[in-house]
């Protein structure tokens, strides 16, 4: 089984390009073994990380994602007090 995750980010305007470059690099790191496919989409002032991964790797890969987020949080605007710096959506991929 595979999981599809879409994570929304809203970089501060002065960090937009730097954040996109950093996210692109992070997604392509070799230790992200569970990733089957990935994309970065931009729309208006938001950046979307779209990742397909093996369900068995979801938990460990999510931990790496949180660690990464902690290094770039200063580049991001908060959406609100609940979601903070990301709006994530993950579910089972129907193939």
Predicted regions and their residues:
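Short, surface-exposed ligand-recognition loops at beta-strand->loop->(often short) alpha-helix junctions
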Residues: 9-21
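Short, acidic/polar N-cap/turn motifs at the starts of alpha helices
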Residues: 6, 37-38
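Active-site-flanking beta-strand signature of metal-NTP-handling nucleotidyl enzymes
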Residues: 3-9, 49-51
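Non-catalytic surface loops within mature trypsin-like serine protease
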Residues: 11-13, 54-56, 91
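An amphipathic, aromatic/His-enriched active-site/gating alpha helix that lines ligand/cofactor pockets
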Residues: 25-37, 53-87
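Short acidic, gly/pro-rich beta-turn/loop elements at beta-sheet edges
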Residues: 17-19, 50, 60-61, 94
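Short, low-order "capping/linker" segments at domain edges
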Residues: 87-95
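A short beta-turn/loop motif at secondary-structure boundaries
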Residues: 40-45
């Amino acid at each position: 089984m595979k999981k599809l995750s879409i994570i929304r980010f809203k970089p501060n305007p002065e960090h937009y390009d730097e954040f996109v470059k950093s996210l692109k690099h992070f997604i392509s790191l070799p230790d992200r073994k569970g990733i089957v496919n990935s994309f970065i989409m931009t729309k208006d002032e938001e950046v979307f990380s779209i990742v397909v991964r093996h369900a068995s790797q979801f938990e460990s890969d999510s931990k790496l994602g949180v660690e990464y987020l902690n290094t770039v949080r200063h580049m991001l605007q908060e959406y609100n007090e609940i979601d903070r710096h990301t709006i994530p959506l993950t579910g089972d991929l129907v193939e």
